[in-house]
């Protein structure tokens, strides 16, 4: 009976670090998934806001409607006075593309900015879809037991139909 004395303490000393490592890893994974989901929701709000606006010039990235949509997605208002919902996510990180269905190729293709394309200021037709993505992604730096892991970018992308004119 004396030979088993202290074995529970030894087992606990061996198992507790492993359980703690799994717990910390789960928390970091949850943080990354939460960040990805929040960025995806922000991009979906941006695309939906743009998809319901009238007279948006998608060929001009400085169009007031485009800028208002980006600010509305990042902050709770259409001006850029408030802080972003996700830290270090800025307006210049968003890439907005317009697409239209090509019946010859039978697929969605990027809509060019011309009178025959989707440039409404030159008399072009509106796009069929709005695609919002991040130009270089959103870099996350996971920390595991005080050690920084290799940083990697999150690259969500959202596509919604365009309902404006």
Model features per residue range: what roles?
Residues 8, 12-27:
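Alpha-helical hydrophobic helix detector
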Residues 24-27, 31, 47-51:
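Short amphipathic alpha-helical interface segments enriched in basic and hydrophobic/aromatic residues
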Residues 1-5:
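N-terminal leader/signal peptides at the extreme start of proteins
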Residues 36, 44-165:
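Short, conserved structural patches
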Residues 28-40:
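Membrane-proximal amphipathic alpha-helices
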